[in-house]
């Protein structure tokens, strides 16, 4: 890394409606002289920072002024991370919404088949038929809600700044 560069390693996740992260990514945000340059994958972070080398970077080379400068960028780092995770959210929605709709349609179709079965086998027993239809409705409503809550994500990412790597003069 060059002097004046700061590489923020970020962990970001986007949960479903049950608070389980469905998008969970680590990435880097590269700044040069206080300006955002680009987002990097973790593989690019490892290469850029030389983390695979035997030499430990930045050992006792960071000044208080550098720490203050890196801290002053945290608001922008969070904004950049939110922007990226919002893009990932939109990609997920575009990919999953048709799948979710198809899954719900299959459940509705299966629910109708169950109702038809009970209507043909219990047509003489009105009370039992109504009871079975209520049971089928509740079962399918519960399962449909579970599918929706499991596959639907919230655009409310959890962002954690894991580390800041800085380029220094040797």
Regions found by a protein language model. Give the residues of each.
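Charged, non-catalytic accessory extensions
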Residues: 1-170
């Amino acid at each position: 890394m060059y002097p004046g560069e700061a590489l923020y390693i970020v962990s970001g996740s986007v949960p479903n409606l049950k608070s389980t992260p469905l998008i969970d990514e680590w990435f880097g945000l590269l700044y040069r002289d206080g300006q955002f340059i680009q987002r990097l994958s973790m593989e690019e972070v490892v290469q850029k920072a030389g983390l695979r080398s035997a030499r430990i970077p930045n050992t006792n080379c960071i000044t208080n002024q550098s720490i203050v400068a890196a801290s002053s960028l945290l608001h922008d780092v969070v904004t950049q991370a939110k922007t990226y995770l919002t893009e990932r959210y939109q990609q997920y929605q575009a990919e999953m919404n048709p799948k979710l709709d198809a899954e719900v349609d299959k459940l509705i179709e299966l629910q109708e088949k169950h109702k038809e079965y009970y209507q043909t086998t219990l047509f003489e027993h009105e009370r039992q038929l109504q009871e079975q239809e209520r049971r089928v409705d509740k079962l399918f409503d519960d399962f449909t809600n579970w599918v929706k809550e499991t596959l639907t994500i919230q655009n409310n990412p959890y962002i954690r700044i894991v580390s800041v790597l800085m380029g220094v003069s040797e």
